Amino acid sequence: MSGNKVEVDKRRTFAIISHPDAGKTTITEKVLLFGNALQKAGTVKGKKSGQHAKSDWMEMEKDRGISITTSVMQFPYGGALVNLLDTPGHEDFSEDTYRTLTAVDSCLMVIDSAKGVEERTIKLMEVTRLRDTPIVTFMNKLDRDIRDPIDLMDEVESVLNIACAPITWPIGSGKEFKGIYHILRDEVVLYQGGMGHTIQDRRVIKGINNPDLEKAIGSYAADLRDEMELVRGASHEFDHAAFLKGELTPVFFGTALGNFGVDHILDGIVEWAPKPLPRESDARVVMPEEEKFTGFVFKIQANMDPKHRDRVAFMRVCSGRYEQGMKMHHVRIGKDVNVSDALTFMAGDRERAEEAYPGDIIGLHNHGTIRIGDTFTQGEKFRFTGVPNFAPEMFRRIRLRDPLKQKQLLKGLVQLSEEGAVQVFRPIDTNDLIVGAVGVLQFEVVVGRLKSEYNVEAIYEGISVSTARWVYCKDERKLEEFRRKCSQNLALDGGDNLTYIAPTMVNLNLSMERYPDIEFAKTREH
């Protein structure tokens, strides 16, 4: 057990959250650069150089310059082993992001310093609040003109309801960006442009009162001293206990594109972020130091390797140790499986995992038996909780251009729904197929992937569906009566769960009044 504890103590598993275009994928690249996982960072937008960002590996992401699926990357840094989960930056992919946040122990929140707190960031912070996830904040894009840093921190505190403790402080911004002052280390790190793709030594001046500071940045030195007097009086000091409870966030400033300030964030994560945490199950709390292996699946990704048309289930290890060839118990289906070919990830590059410990993410080859939310143990029968499915907000009927490909269409849709990209509903009374999504872009992704991966050309038609609810009832007789009377509004989802498809909210409310013994659920545990 002591060997396990040593490995657990080394792990830091975190995700990056942000509003689209705040620079999340760029910062992912630079984090990997500092972790020696990349020799030269790709940049996301424009892509004239042909360097696609390493974490945006799916074809559609490369075309659009947005992160659609969750990538997992592991690298060593500062004596720790860091697992970074890159989440979709586009607002349409909140479900995938939500599930990813159930698999991490801390988050890095990236904010565009010219814009401040944006809508998507607010939503994601609400999700992290559900588990009191510790948050590290990075104020990005200092190489552009930014809002007043004190105003930015005030906004984070008032809008996101979390105290801010500045760790670094900017000196100028935009064309006048000179560098940052590291408050805890009492040193100024000078900025130099044009160093975005490689790691080079920066000039560091020790001490805010060092006369060399005037020589380096002129009148900005006196301004910095004045500003720091103000900042110290107006802001919180870093409190590790408050950070671990999700009540306070350490704030770093920098520019991901200029590769500046990223190492400070990583230093902070390694030093302060929690090691793998205990996990709730429906039977007990599972401690990471336990000897027996446990884990849960938070994502399924189809066709990570177009050459092999495979599916991989992403599993967070919660306790014990994975060893190549070990036997695992797949709790939902009650079967034991031998796993000899689990994978580790470097964003699309896959290597066979010899071993893995709590906090690590491994990939299991999935031939249709594994679903999101599945728990694996070494024999114990319990289920990890807290991996939800949300009722979709948009619906379309999907039609084939070639009616003979109905079988391939259904197979493709079921596989895409199993990986959580979209939800599929098959009405009980008709042969229609209804696709439900959280945002419009998901519909485009599904049609694109059906064509490229399943050779199926499909189109959408409008359908009068406003919302969906999963239907439950303990009384089998009442459920059967409900099925008979409301069959025109009932469908089965991709997992064959009974679902009520409501044409309007009025219709849903009337049905809920008419059938008080039936539960109409907005979310469903996987």
Swiss-Prot record:
GO molecular function per UniProt: GTP binding; GTPase activity; guanosine tetraphosphate binding; translation release factor activity, codon nonspecific; translation release factor activity, codon specific
Organism in which the protein naturally occurs: Shewanella baltica (strain OS223)
Protein name: Peptide chain release factor 3
One GO cellular component term: cytosol
PANTHER family: PEPTIDE CHAIN RELEASE FACTOR RF3
Keyword NADP: no
Gene (UniProt): prfC
Residue ranges annotated for the tr-type G domain, each copy included: 9-277
GO biological process, one term: regulation of translational termination
Annotated keywords: Cytoplasm, GTP-binding, Nucleotide-binding, Protein biosynthesis
Function: Increases the formation of ribosomal termination complexes and stimulates activities of RF-1 and RF-2. It binds guanine nucleotides and has strong preference for UGA stop codons. It may interact directly with the ribosome. The stimulation of RF-1 and RF-2 is significantly reduced by GTP and GDP, but not by GMP.
InterPro entries per record: EF-G-like_DII, EFG_III/V, G_TR_CS, P-loop_NTPase, PrfC, RF3_C, RF3_dom_3_sf, RF3_GTP-bd
Family according to the record: Belongs to the TRAFAC class translation factor GTPase superfamily. Classic translation factor GTPase family. PrfC subfamily.
Binding site for GTP: 18-25, 86-90, 140-143
Pfam families, alphabetized: EF-G_D2, GTP_EFTU, RF3_C
Subcellular location: Cytoplasm
